[in-house]
C-alpha cells in the first residue's frame, strides 16, 4: 500500500512526530551544544509565539535554530505565499530534513552570525520578524554577543525579534546574563507568561526597537 504524501504545509502524523522526537534526541546526544534540548519545541509553544506577531503581512521572516521544524511548519502556514522564510541551522541532519519537509523555506547550513550575508544574498535589507530557537545558555558569551549583534544588524525600526527560554532556568546566572544582553540591544522587551503546557515550561522574550550600535559590554 502506498503512503499518502505529506501535506504542503509540512503537517505530520503522530508516528512522524515520534520519529522526529527520536531523531532530535539522538542529535542532542551527538551535538548537545548546538541542539540544546532533549526534545523539540512543542506546537503549543509555536502557537504561543506566533500569536504575538502578524506573519500574514510579513515579507521576510527568519528562523534561527529551527531544529526539526516544530515552529517552521506553523510559520509557513501563517505566512503569505509570496513571503520569504530564511532558516539558519548548524545540525546537518536537521538541515536535510527541513529541506525535504519544507521546500518553501530557504534553509542554510551556517551559523546565525552570518544572517546579514544571507539577507543580502536575497536582496533583503532587513527582516520583518526574527524567531530564535537557539540554545543561548549553552553558548559562550562571545557567541551570544555575535549572534545578537547580527540580529540587530538584520532589523529595522519596526522589526520584531522573539526568542524563548525555559522557565526553570530563568533565574540562573547564564539566563540572567542573556537577559542583560537583550536589554543592551533593544529599547522595548516584553516577556510572556509561562507556557505551562510546553515540556519543559517556557516563556517568550519579544524584543523591539533595536539599538543599532553597542558600545562594548560591561
What are these regions (language model features)?
Residues 21-56:
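Class I SAM-dependent methyltransferase Rossmann-like catalytic core
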Residues 57-67:
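Conserved class I S-adenosyl-L-methionine
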Residues 68-80:
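Conserved SAM-binding loop of SAM-dependent methyltransferases across substrates and taxa
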Residues 84-89:
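Conserved SAM-binding motif I beta-strand of class I
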Residues 95-124:
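S-adenosyl-L-methionine
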Residues 145-157:
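A short glycine-rich, Lys/Arg-flanked "PGG" loop and its adjoining helix->strand segment in the class I
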Residues 155-165:
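Conserved beta-strand signature within the Rossmann-like core of class I S-adenosyl-L-methionine
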Residues 176-218:
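Class I S-adenosyl-L-methionine
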